[in-house]
């Protein structure tokens, strides 16, 4: 009985592996040079909206202290 269960598990695992490989084989692929050029273009187009590059205006910064510390 144990041998039959192990065999069934192996078959199920093999089917899952084949299904995964078929899915991965159907994915459209592009060359790294094209992907990197597209990524650089996207970054350049959206750089003006990136708060890490442009900074956040102090009037819109929700984390900036509204008042100074009175203890010091």
Curated annotation (Swiss-Prot):
It is a lipid-anchor. GO terms for cellular component: heterotrimeric G-protein complex. The modification Cysteine methyl ester is found at residue 69. A lipid is attached at residue 69 (S-geranylgeranyl cysteine). Residues 70-72 form a propeptide. The modification Phosphotyrosine is found at residue 42. The modification N-acetylserine is found at residue 2. GO terms for biological process: G protein-coupled receptor signaling pathway. SUPFAM superfamilies: Transducin (heterotrimeric G protein), gamma chain. Its main location: membrane. Keywords: Acetylation, Cell membrane, Lipoprotein, Membrane, Methylation, Phosphoprotein, Prenylation, Transducer. It is not sure whether phosphorylation by PKC is on Ser-2 or Ser-3. Present in all tissues tested. GO terms for molecular function: G-protein beta-subunit binding; PDZ domain binding. CDD domains: GGL (cd00068). The modification Phosphoserine is found at residues 3, 26. It is found in: Cell membrane. Belongs to the G protein gamma family. Guanine nucleotide-binding proteins (G proteins) are involved as a modulator or transducer in various transmembrane signaling systems. The beta and gamma chains are required for the GTPase activity, for replacement of GDP by GTP, and for G protein-effector interaction. PANTHER family: GUANINE NUCLEOTIDE-BINDING PROTEIN GAMMA SUBUNIT. This is Guanine nucleotide-binding protein G(I)/G(S)/G(O) subunit gamma-12. It comes from Bos taurus (Bovine). The gene is GNG12.
């Amino acid at each position: 009985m144990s041998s039959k269960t192990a065999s069934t598990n192996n078959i199920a695992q093999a089917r899952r592996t084949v299904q995964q490989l078929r899915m991965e084989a159907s994915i459209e692929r592009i060359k790294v040079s094209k992907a990197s050029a597209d990524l650089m273009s996207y970054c350049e187009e959206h750089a003006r909206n990136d708060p890490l590059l442009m900074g956040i205006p102090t009037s819109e910064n929700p984390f900036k202290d509204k008042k100074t510390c009175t203890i010091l």
